[in-house]
Every structure is written in C-alpha cells, then in structure tokens.
A protein has these predicted regions:
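Short, Lys/Arg- and Gly-enriched loop/turn segments at beta-strand edges
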Residues: 170-177
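Compositionally biased, proline/threonine/alanine/serine-rich low-complexity intrinsically disordered stretches
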Residues: 247-353
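Short beta-strand-centered segments at strand-helix junctions
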Residues: 138-155
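Positively charged n-region of N-terminal signal peptides that target proteins for export
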Residues: 1-4
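Bacterial N-terminal signal peptides
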Residues: 7-15
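Loop/turn positions that initiate beta-strands
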Residues: 159-162
C-alpha cells in the first residue's frame, strides 16, 4: 500500500511539473522517439513522432562535473544495478566499501539507462535521495525519481536520439494564444543567452498578434531568472493552458519550432543487461562538496539522476539479455565481490552521482 501511495504521489508531482513547464526551442525527430534534456531547466522532455509526450524533472551535473552537452544515443538498460564505486571516490570515502548492491541504499536506484558513448560514463537513472530532484548536483549523470526512471526505462527505446541542450530561456504560446516567457539560471556560467535575438522574436510575435508587450516586463523576467513561467500578454492570475507551442526564438522569428523531418527509424531492439550488472560512476574531478545550485522556483516532480559508466572488460558488454525481473526485486552482488552495505544515515551527497 505504501509503494502504491508513493507511486501515485510521484505521478501527481510529475503531472504538476508538466503543467507549469515551458518547452524549449528544439526540432525533435519527426519519426520515432527523441529525448531532450535542458540543463538550465532541469527537465527531460520526451517526444514521440515529433510531439511532446512527457516531461520529467531531473537533476543534472554540477559545474565541476557537468553533464556532457550535445547529441547522444540511448544505450543499454540495467535493472537493479550494482554500483561499483570508482577508485577516486573509494579513496575519498576511505571506508573500504567497493560496491553497493541493489536496494534502498543504492544511489543508482532501480534502473540505469546508458546515455551516449559508454566512455562518457553518463546515464539516466533513479536515486536513493529523491529530494535532490530537480537540481544541479550530480557527478554528470541525469538523475530521476525512481518511479519516473522506471517508467522512462520501460518507454524509451535503445538507439533513440538524445539531445542535451543549454537554453537559458523558453518562449511559448499557449492554447489561449497568450505569450509566456521563462528565464533560467546559468549553472555552468556559459552566459549564452542571446537577449537581442529573444527580444526580436517577442517583438515579431507581438506585431503579428496586435499586442503590446512592455520592454521593462521582459527585462525584469530576464534579470530575475526564477525559472517561473510569466505571461507577457495576460492579466495576473491567468493560468498557463496546454498545449504549448515553442517559438523559434533562437532564430529571432515569430515562427513556431517544428519537428525535423527524419526517415522512419528501423525497429529498435532493446538492449537489457543482466540483473545486477555492475555500473561504475566516474567522478575523478568532483571532490568539491560546494552547495548545489539553487533550484528554479517552478519545481514539478523531484527527480534524481546519477553518473555511472559501464565496467570495461568485466561487464557483459551492451548485449541483449533475458527480460528483467520486476524492479522491486533487488539483485544480489556477485559472491566474488564482498559488499559492505552503506547505512541510510550516510551523507547522501557522497552517494549521489
């Protein structure tokens, strides 16, 4: 009963997140699935045949251990993974623990989905500290709340494209034809928000719709960077109404963002690693436990990702395996690798990757 309650709570929070989240200016694949992760929003957007199907809150890499931007592919999946602690972290912890079995103390949660080339040591996974999602506090991986991670893993196909972007603003038109603007903090200090182009897009839209949008209002939102969705054309108290359309503001026009025409992808075959596969997280340069970036004021579902990397030679490679057991059945660690359980009272920041 408790698990059912927690699952329903997570679902409601995720729905709330989607209801208040503006979408980025992207051109998702017109055919098949496409994952888009906007670092500044701490959100994962899942598109299906060019249409938005789901929004998840996520935690992303800190400034010292940034999540790698660019184009990636979704790789193999590992249910009930064993976390193999990297030597750099073993040295930092200095407690003799080399791995953590599947279960409530495992920072990878019930599932790990490879993101990009295994050499990047990136993944999308669950967490043992759900309150850390959304946020900017992982060692590079994309962390989700465990119920969200399981849902995502069962939905996404191996081989699907995944884009990790860094857009510091969103400009959307809602179902009532109101224009909404959100501006986000700059956790990686990239300072890449082109305000001139953004304002050009706002002006073009306002002219086309016969609206007047005060420049001071736009400037205040861009300066505040609260992450909240602000209506530029409606009275205070009006709610955002879906479906939303993103303006192609990065081009400075009032046109809508459109899917990128792509050939229909070949049927994908999911790659599922054996239960209890060891996943190693590389965090060699992340020894600074500085305070994490403040979360955006609009926070939907708290989700928590981590940063793992498939174990080189010993891992059974990224090859298909038999269907995974229920995620609730934790895998036991290999008998050859003595495992010392980490108490739940341990400082979570040490375990979240």
């Amino acid at each position: 009963m408790k698990k059912l309650f927690l699952g329903l709570t997570a679902a409601l929070l995720t729905s709330a997140a989607a209801a208040n989240t503006l979408i980025p200016d992207v051109s998702p694949a017109s055919s098949g699935q496409h994952v888009v992760i906007n670092i500044t929003q701490q959100r994962l957007f899942l598109y299906d045949n060019g249409k938005l199907s789901k929004i998840y809150p996520v935690a992303v890499g800190k400034a010292m251990t940034q999540t790698t931007l660019g184009e990636h592919k979704i790789g193999a999946k590992a249910y009930n993974p064993v976390w193999h602690i990297p030597k750099s972290i073993q040295k930092e912890r200095n407690d003799g623990v080399k791995s953590v079995p599947a279960g409530p103390n495992n920072p990878l949660g019930p599932v790990f989905v490879r993101l990009g080339d295994p050499k990047l040591s990136l993944g999308i996974h669950g967490t043992n500290a759900p309150a850390s999602v959304p946020g900017v506090r992982s060692h590079g991986c994309v962390r989700m709340k465990s119920p969200d991670a399981l849902e995502f893993a069962k939905t996404i196909a191996t081989g699907a494209p995944a884009s990790v972007i860094y857009q510091m603003a969103s400009l959307n038109e809602d179902a009532n034809q109101n224009l909404w603007l959100a501006a986000y903090r700059d956790p990686y200090n990239k300072k890449n928000l082109d305000t001139a182009t953004l304002k050009k897009s706002i002006a073009a839209w306002a002219k086309a719709h016969g609206k007047t949008i005060p420049a001071a209002r736009v400037d205040a939102i861009l300066k505040g960077r609260t992450g909240a969705a602000n209506c530029l054309t409606c009275a205070k108290g009006v709610k955002l109404k879906s479906p939303l359309k993103s303006l192609a503001w990065t081009s400075g026009t009032d046109a809508y963002s459109k899917p990128k025409v792509m050939p229909k992808p070949a049927p994908a075959k999911d790659v599922v690693l054996p239960q209890g596969t060891e996943i190693e997280v590389d965090a060699t340069d992340d020894t600074n436990k500085a305070a994490s970036e403040p979360k955006q004021s609009v926070r939907p579902t708290p989700v928590k990702p981590a940063k793992p990397a498939a174990k080189p030679a010993t891992t059974p490679a990224e090859t298909p395996a038999s269907a995974p057991k229920a995620a609730s059945e934790p895998a036991t660690a290999p008998a050859s690798a003595p495992v010392k359980e980490i108490p739940a009272s341990s400082e979570p920041e040490d375990l979240l990757f």
